Regions:
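Extracytoplasmic catalytic/substrate-binding loops of multi-pass membrane glycan-assembly enzymes
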Residues: 92-106, 112-136, 142-146, 306-308, ...
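Membrane-proximal stem/loop segments at transmembrane-domain junctions that anchor or position
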Residues: 297-385
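Transmembrane-helix motifs of polytopic, lipid-linked glycan transferases
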Residues: 59-60, 150-170, 208, 413-420
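Short acidic/glycine- and proline-prone juxtamembrane loop motifs at membrane-interface regions
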Residues: 188, 194-202, 245
Length: 486
């Protein structure tokens, strides 16, 4: 039995890395197989130069910086991150647009009144999550279009610090430095900071959750029950909060269960570790459900009406083959048709949309292979959505589009290096859960409404995998075996 579990662990580990490598390779081949693409030569040349010359500079640079005072190096990275992100949002200022306007103006209302009457928010309660946090700052500093960008810059800088800490545990100081530089240089992330959007907030919380998970993983064999419960409750609260902002908490929870019980098998023959793991995950799940219920009650109180409990509309749109699973007017009109019915609550409308979604899925008229393929490429195939949103104020849209996709595919290429190293060394460290998150997010997105900007959190996985690959793929003298490290 023990031999079977060990074999299953190794097989599952490699399978996850192979799936990521397959997804990334398909993206790369699909993107560059279109030789008629505008600026194709510039894009291909840029990605190749970044992958070869850029990786070399990052590897040698991080090796040099590793020998310096680490605290000073980290401090410089924080200052550079803050400076780069802040310079951009101060140079390119834009009023809230489309979905981002909904976030901002909802936050304004929440800063002025405890209860607001907005059926749209009751239909999509996650909007309340970010808007409620933003409303605190609007209440303190007053209404200003610049508060969301400044808040985003601060959150982005905190994220860099967490990326550094996580990457350091996975691959050492060199990997941490490289990951930080990649995060600082990521064009789309820098541009997204201009808007009132939830991604910087929920990704900072996600990184904090990962960091705590890694700490618990390191101590699981000897941790006392009180500290274990504190960590479990803290993670549960953070997951519930993150889900309030962006409903994706199921992905890291499932990833944690797979990592702790299938991949990491220290519990074999050790009853204490078994008990600690079961207690840890059990308290997280139960705590998450309790905190989520309390949060939903609070949102209902602030909106003055029952909120939707199911994403029926998002699933319905996700299976619209004609729109390739993206937003479309007819589906939106159907939702509001039900929502506007006399006596119907937001939850009634979403429950009805869930029924409509089931009928659509079971109709027999959907080519699922084509639909999922289209959604996969819509979700991950391009990284220039931020440019599209910022188009009205950018001086050269083509330049920023090329830069965004060039760097994005450089990340994809080098993240493939990272998973190849992980496959070779059967890496079962926290790198696994970060890789699995990207896969889980992608699979989840295939079931609901899709948009390119939703892959924002997946770029964090790419950054860490890329940094790992850049620093460890060509180390001939180093036999990387950090399976128990993080």
């Amino acid at each position: 039995m023990n031999l079977f579990l060990k074999g299953m662990s190794t097989f599952s580990t490699r399978a996850v890395y192979i799936i990521y490598g397959f997804f990334a390779s398909v993206l790369f081949i699909n993107y560059f197989s279109d030789t008629q693409k505008y600026n194709y030569v510039i894009l291909l040349t840029g990605v190749l130069l970044l992958s070869i010359v850029g990786s070399f500079i990052l590897r040698k640079g991080s090796l040099y910086l590793e020998k310096l005072n680490e605290k000073k190096c980290f401090f410089v990275l924080v200052i550079v991150c803050l400076a780069v992100k802040l310079t951009w949002v101060l140079s390119y200022q834009i009023q809230p647009l489309v979905d981002y306007a909904t976030f901002y103006y909802t936050a304004e209302e929440l800063s002025e009144s405890f209860v607001i009457n907005k059926r749209y928010i009751a239909l999509f309660p996650h909007i309340f999550g970010y808007a409620s946090v933003l409303s605190i700052f609007l209440k303190i500093f007053g209404s200003s279009y610049m508060i969301p960008p400044i808040l985003n810059v601060i959150l982005t800088t905190i994220s860099m610090g967490l990326i550094y800490a996580i990457s350091r545990k996975i691959g050492g100081v060199k990997t941490a430095i490289t990951a930080s530089v990649l995060w600082i240089a990521l064009p789309s992330q820098t541009m997204y900071n201009m808007f009132a959007l939830s991604e910087p907030l929920y990704c900072t919380v996600l990184l904090l959750i990962w960091m705590i998970m890694i700490i618990v993983h390191e101590k699981i064999a000897n941790i006392n029950i009180k500290r274990l419960l504190v960590y479990s409750i803290l993670i549960a609260a953070l997951l519930a909060f993150m889900n309030m902002v962006r409903p994706i908490a199921a992905v890291p929870i499932i990833a944690l269960v797979i990592w702790f019980f299938i991949i990491d098998i220290k519990q074999i023959g050790n009853k204490k570790i078994w008990l600690n793991k079961i207690t840890y995950v059990g308290v997280i799940v139960v705590g998450y459900l309790i905190f989520s219920s309390a949060i939903n009650q609070y949102i209902t109180l602030r909106l003055g009406e029952e909120i939707a409990s199911t994403p029926g509309y998002n699933i319905y749109v996700g299976f619209n083959e004609e729109s390739s699973g993206k937003w479309n007017k007819p589906d939106a009109e159907l939702l509001f048709y039900y929502s506007d019915k006399p006596g119907w609550t937001a939850d009634d409308a979403q429950q009805k949309m869930l029924e409509e979604a089931k009928e659509r899925v079971q109709s027999g008229n959907i080519d699922f292979v084509k639909l999922f393929s289209d959604k996969f490429f819509s979700f991950l195939g391009d990284d220039s959505s931020a440019v599209d949103y910022a188009g009205p104020i950018l001086d050269n849209i083509v330049r920023y589009t090329v830069a965004s996709n060039m760097f994005y595919y450089f990340l994809i290429a080098t993240s493939i290096l990272g998973v190849l190293v992980a496959i070779k060394n059967k890496n079962k460290s926290s790198l696994f859960i970060i890789c699995l998150f990207a896969i889980g997010l992608t699979m989840a997105q295939l079931l609901v409404e899709v948009a390119s900007r939703y892959h924002y959190s997946a770029t964090i996985s790419m950054v860490i995998l890329a940094a790992f690959g850049i620093n460890h793929a060509f180390n001939k003298k180093e036999n990387i075996d950090i399976n128990e490290k993080a």
